[in-house]
Regions:
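His/acidic metal-ligating clusters that form di-metal
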Residues: 28-29, 33, 103-175
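Acidic, His/Gly-rich catalytic cores of divalent-metal-dependent hydrolytic chemistry
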Residues: 172-237
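Active-site environment of divalent metal-dependent phosphoester hydrolases
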Residues: 12-17, 42-45, 71-76, 136, ...
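Active-site neighborhood of phospho(di)ester-bond hydrolases with catalytic His/Asp-centered motifs
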Residues: 8-9, 34-39, 65-70, 129, ...
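Beta-strand-turn-beta hairpins that frame and shape the catalytic cleft
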Residues: 1-6, 121-127, 196-200
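N-terminal active-site segment of His-dependent metallophosphoesterases
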Residues: 1-53, 57-60
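Active-site neighborhood of divalent metal-dependent phosphoester bond hydrolases
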Residues: 43-44, 50-123, 147-151
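Short aromatic-enriched loop/helix-cap "lid" or pocket-rim segments at secondary-structure transitions
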Residues: 77-81, 140-141, 173-176, 234-235
Length: 237
């Protein structure tokens, strides 16, 4: 059976969209593992129902494997789970009102669960992180320079990095290349060459836009639950 990963992010309390994604995934052939790469909470709606569904999946749901994202990090900081840190980044960018709305959107009952989530996963030769290996808020886009992409991959020691912070869907490939380095020593300068294998960075999207990854074939499919196909089955070969 084909092994596939479904990667979602940016629901921000939207239980209806999560249910639509779960329903969509039931139509897809293969052995599917569901990863939720953060931003489950947000300031625009009450997030308790979605969080409860993630913690307590309904019969027939794919079990979600969750990590925390930027919005969870800001919430936990404001709630005292990050030492003396507060939600300064959110406060600076969105204002005090949004910080208060975020705090009010999540019942304190769920904070310990959010605080228990990991920063990211490393599966096979793939890194699954909300931002990047550098920072939870690191926003990788299609315009990020290749050297920065290579740095983020190298920090984790992976060949594939799945990221969600930008909310974009993209697949950037770093083809076989050679990195030259020059070392200055007492006995003279030396040049070293290091071959870099083919690597990739994938933006998984957000909200209704999600990504399906075929583990065996290394193929990426960008999907959404806004455009529903007429067929009841989605095979992807």
């Amino acid at each position: 059976m084909i092994e596939r990963w479904a990667l979602i992010s940016g629901l921000k309390g939207d239980l209806e969209t999560y249910e639509r994604i779960q329903k969509d995934l039931k139509k897809i052939r293969g052995d599917i593992t569901l990863f939720v790469l953060g931003d489950m909470v947000g300031a625009k709606r009450n997030c308790n129902s979605l969080i409860d569904r993630l913690i307590n999946p309904h019969p027939g749901d794919l079990k979600p494997h969750c990590i925390y994202g930027w919005w969870e990090d800001q919430l936990l900081a404001e709630r005292g789970y990050r030492g003396e840190q507060k939600a300064d980044a959110l406060r600076l960018n969105k204002g005090e009102g949004i910080v208060k709305a975020l705090v009010n959107a999540v019942d304190p009952y769920y904070l310990n669960w959010l605080a228990s989530l990991e920063f990211g996963f490393v599966e096979l030769d793939c890194g699954l992180i909300h931002g990047s290996s550098k920072d939870i808020g690191d926003k990788i886009t299609i315009d990020t320079p290749p050297l920065i992409l290579l740095d983020r991959l190298t920090r984790l020691g992976v060949n594939r990095l799945f990221t969600a912070r930008s909310s974009q869907q993209f697949h950037l490939e770093l083809t076989d290349a050679v990195v030259n380095s020059y070392i200055k020593a007492l006995d003279g300068d030396r040049k070293q060459e290091q071959k870099v294998p083919k690597r990739g960075v994938i933006g998984i999207g957000a909200g209704a836009y999600y990504t399906l990854y075929d583990v065996g074939s290394d193929k990426t499919h960008f999907l959404n639950v806004l455009d529903q196909p007429k067929s009841n089955t989605r095979g992807f070969g």
